[in-house]
Amino acid sequence: MEATLENGFAKVAAGDWLMGRAQPAACLGSATTKGLKGFIVPDRACVRAVTCAGDAWCGAADRPFLTRLDALPDVPLVLVSAKLLVAPFGARAGARCVKLVPFSFNRATPVTEFKLGWAVAGTKSRVTRVALEDGATLTVRPESMVAWTGKDPTGFCPKLSVLDILLPRGPRTLAWNFHGPCVVWFEGTQEESVRPRGWRR
C-alpha cells in the first residue's frame, strides 16, 4: 500500500498497514489539521498496523513514524506496534491532554489505553493505571514512563525538553505527586499519599 504525501505527512485509511524503518531518535512533528502537535519518540522499531475509525498519520520517507491517531468519539482505537512511545503535548480545544514521558527505551511494547484519540504505549503488562478522585493524591517513583491526564504533577518533576526525553538526566529517586481528578499510567512504585507542600487542614 502506498500512501499519498500531503504537506510532509502520509494520510492512511483506517485498517491499512503502516511500516517504518528503525530510527532511535525523537522527531518533532505537527499534524496539519486541528493544530495538534506532539513529540514522536520511536524505539528502534516499526509501526505494525493501525486500525481506527478516523485517519492515521505517518511521517514522510525520512520521518517514517506515526505522528498521531485521530479517532471519533466513543469509537475503539487499536495500535499494534513492536516498540513505540508517543508523547503528545497538544490537546483539542476544551479537552484534556494525555502526556507521556518515557524514561527508558529498552522494554517498550503496547498498552491498550487511549484517551481523546491519543495512543499511550507502555511496557507489556507492567503499566499500572490509577484513577484519582477529586482531592486524592498519588505519589509515584517512576522507573520507565509516566502518562497522565489533568493537572501536571508536583514534586521533583522539572519541565522536560527533547534532551530529557532522549537522554533522561533525572535521578532514580524521582517522586511525582499527582492530584485528582486525573488518570495516571506509570511503571514504578506507588507510595502512600503525600500532603502537598504548604497543605494545611
Show the residue positions of the predicted features.
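Phosphate/adenylate-binding glycine loop and adjacent helical scaffold
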Residues: 1-201
